[in-house]
């Protein structure tokens, strides 16, 4: 912990801080960053506001910590996939898609950074920067997998890989929002099915 009580870089948060982070992540995914307060955290976890402020002196610091943890979690998974030369490019894409399917199975959760993007103009600058980084990192990773798929004869692309990567990412994020509105799981499953079909070479469909 730092002198202010915030988790310091390179040091694992305490169990209480992790509880706060877990809840804040869920609240952002289901309500929005703007729509939750320290009072919500206090009520849900039975903590005093002073205790919450000890770990995260400001809501902006809590928001940054939530995004940093989320980005790191995704980043570690993507880095591990990059090292797996045995899996097909479609298998890697399927692995990437799994979190979207898991979110879609819930009544109200969506991607954390997708949720934050919807209120980008009211986020603290340090959070906006991290959300933008999440997007560009995922665009780049997807583009790499798509290019690998083309080189191996597993994918066919109608446009440059980075453009298709942006299409895939935006389609998945948007499908989650529509599914949350309609409650229809097909909103996500159909988008995924069409994306995969369009990437598959005609001879192997």
Segments from the language model and where they lie:
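N-terminal intrinsically disordered/low-complexity leader segments
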Residues: 1-15, 205
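Amphipathic alpha-helical packing segments from all-alpha helical-bundle domains
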Residues: 75, 90, 94, 106, ...
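Helix-turn-helix
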Residues: 19, 23-61, 65
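Short helix-capping/turn signature of helix-turn-helix
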Residues: 56, 116-123
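Amphipathic C-terminal alpha-helical segment
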Residues: 34, 103, 148, 168-186, ...
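Hydrophobic alpha-helical connector segments
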Residues: 65, 69, 79-109, 161-168
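A general structural signal for well-ordered alpha-helical segments in protein cores
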Residues: 38, 59, 63, 93, ...
